[in-house]
């Protein structure tokens, strides 16, 4: 099957992927259904499995096909969130105002996972990430998607969740990643430190096991050794990304991001 440009392929993800040729896609950005959080009303849907192990197995099967379809230099960006074990029956935790869950979804209030205690955080993102690594993927980065406007939670015995994971996965050791396109400005204090002098007695001018030499910014130098044109104005993007979700007036099971 030849992939057509500017065409949306609808269907079961695993079945559609199996029809696509090898090494045909440069990038995959996806957020599969989270485990035991929503019911989309589809038979055989991912996310309603009886155990976390079954969920991880199905996700791994889908991404095995993604890896086959991905080009050797391609990248895959996987957004996924975690799930808590329930503490009792659904009736015990049902919100009378939203008997079917907010936005109409059937939330697994009472979901329990073998091997986990009630109220345990299951650790779904890392179970998936490690399973994909075991299936041959290169696990290159774990990125924190930080939301400053998270959904409120009524819990009073733990912090409110305000982040999800984004995993960068690759098919090969070497792949396409344009770091300059996503670079961020250096802090003004960094430029100031580079312009200043550093004495040989600087406490940071030491090595530690596994580090051959001190960081560049801490090496002994005369004041003014670094001119403005010698200092890069940008640095590699870090792995905590603050991206808020956008508010919408219509029913939407997953809120879009602002950017």
What are these regions (language model features)?
Residues 1-253, 259:
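Core catalytic lobe of class I
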């Amino acid at each position: 099957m030849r992939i057509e440009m500017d065409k949306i392929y609808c269907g079961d993800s695993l079945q559609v992927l199996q029809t696509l040729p090898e090494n045909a896609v440069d990038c995959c950005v996806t957020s599969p259904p989270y485990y035991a959080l929503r019911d989309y009303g589809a038979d055989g849907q991912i996310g309603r499995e009886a155990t976390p192990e079954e969920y991880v197995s199905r996700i791994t099967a889908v991404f095995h096909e993604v890896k086959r379809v991905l080009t050797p230099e391609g990248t895959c960006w996987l957004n996924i969130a975690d799930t808590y074990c329930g503490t009792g029956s659904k009736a015990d935790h049902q919100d009378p105002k939203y008997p079917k869950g907010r936005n109409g979804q059937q939330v697994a209030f009472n979901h329990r996972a073998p091997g986990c205690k009630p109220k345990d955080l299951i650790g779904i993102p890392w179970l998936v990430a490690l399973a994909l690594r075991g299936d041959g993927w290169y696990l290159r980065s774990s990125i924190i998607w930080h939301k400053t406007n998270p959904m409120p939670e009524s819990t009073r015995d733990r912090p409110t969740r305000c982040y999800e994971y984004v995993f960068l996965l690759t098919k090969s050791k070497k792949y396409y990643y344009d770091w300059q396109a996503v670079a961020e400005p250096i802090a003004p204090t960094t430029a100031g430190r580079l312009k200043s002098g550093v004495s040989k007695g600087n406490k940071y001018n030491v090595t530690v096991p596994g580090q051959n030499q001190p960081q560049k910014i801490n090496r002994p130098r005369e004041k003014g050794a670094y001119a403005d044109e010698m200092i890069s104005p940008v640095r590699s993007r870090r792995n905590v990304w603050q991206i808020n979700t956008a508010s919408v007036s219509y029913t939407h099971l997953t809120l879009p991001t602002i950017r």
